Amino acid sequence: MSDTAYPQAPGSEGPGRVVGRAPSAVYPELAGSTAVVTGAARGMGAVFAEGLALRGVNVIAADIDLDAMKATAEAVNARQDALPEGTARGRVIPAAVDVADPAGHEELARLAHTEFAGLDHWVNNAGIFPFAYISDISPEQIDAVLKVNVEGVLFGSQAAARHMRPGGAIVNMSSVSAVRVRRGRGAYCASKASVAHLTESLAVELGDKGLRVNSIAPGYIDTEMTRWVQEDPTALRHALDSVPLHRLGSPQEVLGVLLFLLSDSARYVTGHSIAVDGGSRHV
């Protein structure tokens, strides 16, 4: 383990952390479109929902925890209402979804058409992270992670393919763990590798429909999912040692890539996984 004392980046809140800044790119073509975002009650999903709404995108924001989703949507909409007149403002509609249930995704697509008369983008963000060694993981844990992380992406993409307008984009959340394994994360790593390959297959099959499919592969991002790392000095040091930029990423930095992939700037980009990991896959 390195003994290097990593300096704080400008604007950072602590060693290895950086204050998230909103992406500067506006992408005006997104205004007036409609997106579904799963796993949107907290973490990166909540940042995605608000970041899209700030660019005039109407969002069906879904989570298995409906109460938390309603609270997040209410807060985002209140901040939207406080923006100056003339500012692009989307609305966030909260919804409940169990991503392991195909019918739940169909309901989200129906809601998008009912509330906003169409569907343009789909973000398969919901996921779970069970920490368990291969020798100890239970069949129930394996089943749960595959249902949420893999089947959830598949079922969401199927619904998107059936209901999205031509020219639409699907973005799936993979992970640096798809290519860089860690102890105690076997099932999670396998699920995220599956997402990366599923994304490629979807891109090939849905190209005829005029739909693009890409994935984002985050590394250590400052969210609730990495709180255990941040609260353990030894774990944090190990994490920072494995990142060439020597800090955690912010959800806003992942949002910037998401906005690009949904925008016209990426209209010839499909079947790819974009890493947002500070270079950690190369260490």
Residue ranges and their predicted role:
Residues 2-26, 180, 259, 270-283:
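Short C-terminal tail/terminal secondary-structure segment
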Residues 157, 191, 199:
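Active-site helix of classical SDR
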Residues 116, 154, 163, 247-276, ...:
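C-terminal substrate-recognition "lid" of short-chain dehydrogenase/reductases
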Residues 137, 181-189, 201, 226:
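Active-site loop-to-helix junction immediately N-terminal to the catalytic Tyr of the SDR YXXXK motif
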Residues 175:
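Residue(s) in the substrate-gating loop at a strand-loop-helix junction
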Residues 162, 204-208, 267:
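Alpha-helical segment proximal to the catalytic Tyr-Lys
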Residues 133-134, 141-143, 239:
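Substrate-binding pocket helix/loop in short-chain dehydrogenase/reductase
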